[in-house]
């Protein structure tokens, strides 16, 4: 009985440790609000090629992000989408704070093509431009955000 309990406790600790690592890979850097991090990751009127554009994000994350989408629009335009009817988020069905854009926007989707890269300076991406609708999760602004926008985008849920 004791060895089983001990083994179970070790398995639980390993599982919790892995969940913590996975969570930290998706966490925003602490110096940014959720809206600021959203803007860094997903807003660019004229993004350069993906390999260059992703360097900024990867430098904060200390690893190669598997994929990312840059919306070629302004932060203010995405904030306006937050005023659209609330819908259930498509990727996280437990959230009801998502909003779908009414218009397609130009975008650039980046896919990591060398997932085994050991150094973030070696991350390479394939560029996939497109024009799609998008769904964003929105929340009340953080105190550090500009009071100009009471509700701000905090997560790009999907593109359609």
Curated annotation (Swiss-Prot):
Q: Which GO terms describe its cellular component?
A: extracellular space
Q: Which residues carry this modification: 3'-nitrotyrosine?
A: 60
Q: Where would I find glycosylation on this chain? A: 84, 92, 119
Q: What start-end ranges are recorded for coiled-coil regions in this protein?
A: none
Protein's organism: Gorilla gorilla gorilla (Western lowland gorilla)
Name the UniProt record assigns to this protein: Eosinophil cationic protein
Q: What is its EC number?
A: 3.1.27.-
Where are the catalytic residues? Answer: 42, 155
- Where are the residues of the annotated region Required for nearly all of the bactericidal activities? 28-72
Per its UniProt record, what Gene3D superfamilies does this chain match? Ribonuclease A-like domain (3.10.130.10)
UniProt GO MF annotations:
endonuclease activity; lipopolysaccharide binding; nucleic acid binding; RNA nuclease activity
Disulphide bonds in the chain: 50-110, 64-123, 82-138, 89-98
**Complex and partners:** Interacts with bacterial lipopolysaccharide (LPS) and lipoteichoic acid (LTA). In vitro interacts with phospholipid bilayers.
Q: Where in the cell is it found?
A: Secreted
Which lineage do the record's taxonomy fields give for this organism?
A: Eukaryota, Metazoa, Chordata, Craniata, Vertebrata
Q: Which UniProt keywords apply?
A: Disulfide bond, Endonuclease, Glycoprotein, Hydrolase, Nitration, Nuclease, Secreted, Signal
Question: Where along this sequence does the record place binding of substrate?
Answer: 65-69
Give the signal peptide, or none.
1-27
What job does the chain carry out? Answer: Cytotoxin and helminthotoxin with low-efficiency ribonuclease activity. Possesses a wide variety of biological activities. Exhibits antibacterial activity.
The family database entries (Pfam families) matched by this protein are listed as: RnaseA
Enzyme class (EC, first level): hydrolase
Please provide the Gene Ontology terms (biological process) for this protein. antimicrobial humoral immune response mediated by antimicrobial peptide; chemotaxis; defense response to Gram-negative bacterium; defense response to Gram-positive bacterium; induction of bacterial agglutination; innate immune response in mucosa
